[in-house]
Amino acid sequence: MTIYLCIAFNMVNTYIDYLRLRKYWKILNQIKKHREEIKQLTNNCLKIKTTEFKKRIKSGISLDQILPETFAVASEAAERVLGLNPYDVQMIGGIVLHEGKIAEMKTGEGKSLAASFPAYLNALTEKGVHIITVNDYLARRDYESIGKIFEFLGMKVGLINQYTPISKRKNNYLADITYVTNSEIGFDYLRDNMATQIKELTQRPFHFCIIDEVDSILIDESRTPLIISGRTKTRKDKYELAHRLANFLKKSIHYKIDEKNRTIILSDLGVITCEKILKIKSIYSAQNTWAHFIYNALKAKELYLKNVHYIVRDQQAIIVDEFTGRIMPERRWADGLHQSIEAKENLQIKEETKTLASITYQNLFLLYLKISGMTGTAKTEENELISIYSLPVICIPTYKSMIRKDLPDLIFQTEIEKLKAVTEECVKMHLLGRPILVGTTNIQKSEILSQLLNQYQIRHNLLNAKPQNVKRESEIIAQAGRKYAVTISTNMAGRGTDIILGGNLEYIIKNKITSLFKPIILTGNTQYIIIDKSLKSSGNEIRDINSNILKIINLHRQNPKLTIAEFGNSLNIASKKIKSNNEYILNLRSIYIIFENIYKKYFDIESKEVKNIGGLCVIGTERHESRRIDNQLRGRSGRQGDVGSSIFFISLEDNLLRIFGGERISKMMHTFMPSVNEPIQSPLLSRSLDSAQKKVESLHYNFRKQLFQYDQILNSQRKAIYLERRLILESNEIVAWTMAYMELTIIDILNDQYLYSHRKPRDKVLKNINKIYDLLASPISLIKIEKYTFNKKTILKQLKISYDLKKAQIDKTSCGLMKSLERSLILEQIDTNWSEHIQQMSFLKEFIGWRGYAQKDPLIEYKNESYILFIKMIRTIRQNILYLLFRAEPTLDFS
């Protein structure tokens, strides 16, 4: 019954997508009509169209009204500049992006070009468009190629990556369209909200963004906040002792492991044992807490494994991203977990950090007025994307029909039998000459499989997060579609890689040309380069290559400081056939075209041979916890209508089945399996596995949703504090802010006297008031305060007099010094106390869950407690400003 309901549900979804797409086909026909008219325009007239569109928008025309015409202009520019005539499906993808939705476009369907059309349209508002990518390489690649379309149409294009200096960031953010990575835009946002001078600000208000690999950023990365941190004291001895203690404790006796929620639960015996060994009364004591260190040490021991969750390189524990398989050297686990792993691996324990500013990607991208995104896999997560970001997913049809065969899973009883079967399948496919991509879930398993293939003497490439393999990533992926190629990879090959049957011709040619010129660039020796004698080409082609090489050598003599990176950028432009008047690029292009003519015929022959034997064979060695990650692996095969196949080899010992599969699946498999060595291939079991994955996805979604609900409370406070901070930074009337803070402080203290005297001892309130009078240099003493009738006007009047005296005193040292002092003091107090507040909120969130045992809603409790903490922080900021400002003493220079 459940299966039939799933089929019916999928049919309904397919029909809804059809109805949505029908609307886009109508708009597409309008675009085509405009395109026919625009083809007649000269390049200059096409460029003038941008100015015309801007005027029409200012006159009140909506973006939707001019969409067909702007898309026609941008598509015509793409053909003239890049020689790319957009497919209909790319135009439809662009319309979907403009509407603030997610376009699900499969591998090789041209997402970068599709994004150019809505980017151009929305940039006409002159409020800026950000195209967000997941790494620097993709940002630069699209900036250098697709960016030429915008420049041709008279728009300014910016690029921001980790190497962009602060001095250039502001101008790049002010560009009409800016290519930037998700991490850079997040850290720039945080840095802007820690700036102490207006000139340090880099960003303008967020308007519209197009996020590439949107599911990776908004779902996979959503749990990981961006953090700017400062150093704090670290109790290294506690981490080391906790590690030794964790090694002594025994699983199932002293503690239990909850693998579903990835947590450790200490038993009563475990708690008593820890307290006895440490010679303390309680590991949960607030004065000398040990619980935090013990739990982290046990997590490091049981849940965080070397070569699975992290690698050790150069005496450092480096995180491996579970979704991409890549290392993240700049990131560290928070709350002391990373220090516990360092203690476990006997590495130097680095200092703990204190959070100065933080934000999640969820809340960062919700700052935009309009968000859209593109990816090859998002439909399975549509409910989450709609509920949190209001982003529906529209599946864009492929340009060519998908003919890849996705075979039912092969299921084994044991891990060993499964890996043997994978190896045998690789041998079988290899004998046929089919290229094979084997996807594994972590480094450890990829290396085991590599050893098994070595036993069969099968040559293969290994791609995982280890440095020696990462260096060869581009080369491995470029060759992965060639005949007889066998590639074993972690999730590194699951996203953003384009495996071309027969091999990647562009990569090979670029590599050849780079190797020709590398000696010149590195040594500066501009002697004649000898062409590879194995090059199969005519004498005329050799002469043409040599002629262009000589021209480039002469240009190198004029610019001897050219770097490999700069040469690579020029070669990228040359290979893309982008129009250029640069003599250096034109000569490189001539060489590229000659090499292309020589090698293309050989690659075409091999491509045809690979297609005839079945295309790329993708083998998954384990189902991931998310169907989306599995689909990304499958999507490496069958690009742009190519033949191919995918199959998953699974065992009962895999984490998904062991932790989440349940007894039902296990019983089904034992019933169906004839023997330990014989696998099962059953659509019914495959659907049961899908069901298990959905359970895990639901679990993770609920966890992310809960995090989002908690983070929204902190986010509302962040918005309030950052808004006030920005107003102070930009204010010309800083005196008004100072007086407001000081007046509110006095009013708070007076309210304490009148309203809360029953809660606070009277002598404490009187002491606070007496401090104010001391600061204001008032003759009223504590004795007089007892008989004094508090009059707000009198005190505030005294405040104004005292402030004027202090200002005159400080400005004697340097004219305008008081104003600078006030601004820096207020900003410093906001930053310091906000950082403390973040720490307190983190502790609150960590322990608020225990309120559930008292039949209280932890979220409501968190909201109430956080409000009290926020008000307390605001009062502390104001009070500190009052006290510090009146205590400030100028240093006079009598020299």
Curated annotation (Swiss-Prot):
Molecular function GO labels: ATP binding; protein-exporting ATPase activity
Main localisation: plastid
EC annotation from Swiss-Prot or TrEMBL: 7.4.2.8
HAMAP family assigned: SecA (MF_01382)
Transmembrane region(s): none
Uppermost EC category: translocase
Entry-linked NCBIfam families: PRK12904.1, secA
Cellular localisation: Plastid, Chloroplast stroma; Plastid, Chloroplast thylakoid membrane
UniProt membrane topology term: Peripheral membrane protein
Keywords: ATP-binding, Chloroplast, Membrane, Nucleotide-binding, Plastid, Protein transport, Thylakoid, Translocase, Translocation, Transport
PANTHER family according to UniProt: CHLOROPLAST PROTEIN-TRANSPORTING ATPASE, SECA INNER MEMBRANE COMPONENT OF SEC PROTEIN SECRETION SYSTEM
Full protein name: Protein translocase subunit SecA
GO annotation, biological process: intracellular protein transmembrane transport; protein import; protein targeting
Binding site for ATP: Q90, G108, E109, G110, K111, S112, D498
Catalytic reaction list: ATP + H2O + cellular proteinSide 1 = ADP + phosphate + cellular proteinSide 2
Superkingdom per UniProt: Eukaryota
Stated family: Belongs to the SecA family.
Function noted in UniProt: Has a central role in coupling the hydrolysis of ATP to the transfer of proteins across the thylakoid membrane.
A single GO cellular-component term on record: chloroplast stroma
